[in-house]
């Protein structure tokens, strides 16, 4: 009887052991399955905003800016407060970001330089194409690659690459939908400069009639449904690029009598070298001041910016309400900054802070912490290698010249040294460190600013011997490769 009881007990013990083992195996399998689920490739929502300077609320560029949606996005993740473009012009900046190569490497400095025509980038794979090659579904809408001003017949197509996309709005061969324009233009400026394209005015139309609204409406549909592959969705918002036309309600948010001009110094160009003064030679500032249009232009920019922010809000709401929200990394970036009278300069195409500094916000569920800021200098050139790491992709065939900032996403800390370099034309460069901006032009002339004591860059310290060591160090970081321009710049190359 005892033997039978022992045998029965042994069987029970062995059975219990088997159950424990099976339970452990099941738990391990479940954990592995969960780990696999967590590590599934993230979707990417890639939002490009044209001519977006630091007048975003969270960056404090202008006290009257109304950008609640971009501000809320910054609270969801990491805001880079010291991010800069690689070139202060639409085409050169975007080509550099999308190719992962410096303008000084490609020779693409101007808006007229079609990246598709240079042999140097024939073997390079641009960012959307790389995502497609790595198994992503690539969708796009609006301006990602450069497109001409919408007064130009080439505006609708631009320099896009049809083979990189599974679908594009309005079409694979047309980046931009037709834009709403006043019956007669210019409304407030003059055809004497920029052919009248530099203009601003309210439009008596609904928001949904704007080209950007059509782009965003299409993108919202893509965010509302599931896809059979991880999704790379690029959305290009054209405002606040000139002309600053927007529905009336956006102008109403900024009554002209209450408009504040940007902080400026009347004689701010006095200590600039001749090469720098050449950047203000278009005389737009003189015309605007003489015709009492400075406040009107600022109102136009603020209105267009507010409209663009509403478009960003539409995208974020669609993402949050759709099936992709939990596994989507969001990147919002401006292609370059913009002057509105600072240093008597209007537009971009310069190497000062107002032109190079851009909003850059990253929200990555597995990598970023809400409500964090990072003042380490980063470049838009760094986005390509960062996304390769975030999505665990293979490297593209070209050697990317940017530096991944994935480590900054994870801890929003700092590195021993990191700088952002901006190039305007051949051999004109700016180096931005955490505290200083150093500019050297092709003729050897220089500028140096200390942002700790001079955030508006009103005092050029380049001739102050006390800063010689700092200047020498920053100069040593300037690119040594300075390729000739791909094509001669065109006189009309200002869009």
How does the language model describe each region?
Residues 1-2, 495:
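Accessible peptide chain termini
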Residues 2-18:
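Bacterial N-terminal signal peptides that target proteins for export
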Residues 15-27:
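Bacterial N-terminal signal peptides
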């Amino acid at each position: 009887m005892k033997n039978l009881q022992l045998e029965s007990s042994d069987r029970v013990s062995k059975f219990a052991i088997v159950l424990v083992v099976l339970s452990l195996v099941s738990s391990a399998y479940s954990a592995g399955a969960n780990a696999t689920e967590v590590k599934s490739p993230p979707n990417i929502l890639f939002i490009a905003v044209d001519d977006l300077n630091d007048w975003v609320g969270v960056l404090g560029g202008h006290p009257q800016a109304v950008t609640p949606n971009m501000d809320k996005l910054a609270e969801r993740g990491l805001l880079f407060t010291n991010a800069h473009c690689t070139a202060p012009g639409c085409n050169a900046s975007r080509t550099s970001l999308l190719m992962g190569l410096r303008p000084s490497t490609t020779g693409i400095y101007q808006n007229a330089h079609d990246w598709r025509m240079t042999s140097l980038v024939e073997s390079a794979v641009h960012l959307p194409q790389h995502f497609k090659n790595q198994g992503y579904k690539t969708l796009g809408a609006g301006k990602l690659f450069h497109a001409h001003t919408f007064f130009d017949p080439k505006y609708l197509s631009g320099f896009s690459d049809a083979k990189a996309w599974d679908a594009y709005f309005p079409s694979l061969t047309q980046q931009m939908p037709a834009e709403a324009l006043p019956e007669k233009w210019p409304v407030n400026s003059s055809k004497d400069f920029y052919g009248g394209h530099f203009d601003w005015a309210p439009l008596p139309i609904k928001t949904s009639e704007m080209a950007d609204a059509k782009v965003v409406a299409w993108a919202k549909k893509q965010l509302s449904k599931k896809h059979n592959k991880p999704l790379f969705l690029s959305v290009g918002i054209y405002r606040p690029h000139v002309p600053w036309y927007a529905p009336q309600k956006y102008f109403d948010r900024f009554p002209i009598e209450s408009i504040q001009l940007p902080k400026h110094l009347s004689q701010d160009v006095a200590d600039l070298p001749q090469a720098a003064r050449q950047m203000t030679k278009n005389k737009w500032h003189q015309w605007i001041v003489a015709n009492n249009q400075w406040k009107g232009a600022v109102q136009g920019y603020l209105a267009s910016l507010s409209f663009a922010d509403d478009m960003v809000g539409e995208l974020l709401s669609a993402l949050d309400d759709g099936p992709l929200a939990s596994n989507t990394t969001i990147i919002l970036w401006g292609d370059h900054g913009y002057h509105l009278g600072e240093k008597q300069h209007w537009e971009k195409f310069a190497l000062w802070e107002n032109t190079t500094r851009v909003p850059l916000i990253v929200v990555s569920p597995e990598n970023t912490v809400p409500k964090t800021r990072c003042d380490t200098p980063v470049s838009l050139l760094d986005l390509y290698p960062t996304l390769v790491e975030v999505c665990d992709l293979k490297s593209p065939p070209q050697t990317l010249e940017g530096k991944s900032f994935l480590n900054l996403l994870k801890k929003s800390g700092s590195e021993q040294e990191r700088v952002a370099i901006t190039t305007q034309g051949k051999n004109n460069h700016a180096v931005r460190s955490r505290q200083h901006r150093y500019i050297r032009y092709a003729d050897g002339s220089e500028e140096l600013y200390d942002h700790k004591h001079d955030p508006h860059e009103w005092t050029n310290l380049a001739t102050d011997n006390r800063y010689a060591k700092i200047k020498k160090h920053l100069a040593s970081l300037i690119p040594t490769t300075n390729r000739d321009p791909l094509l001669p710049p065109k006189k009309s190359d200002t869009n």
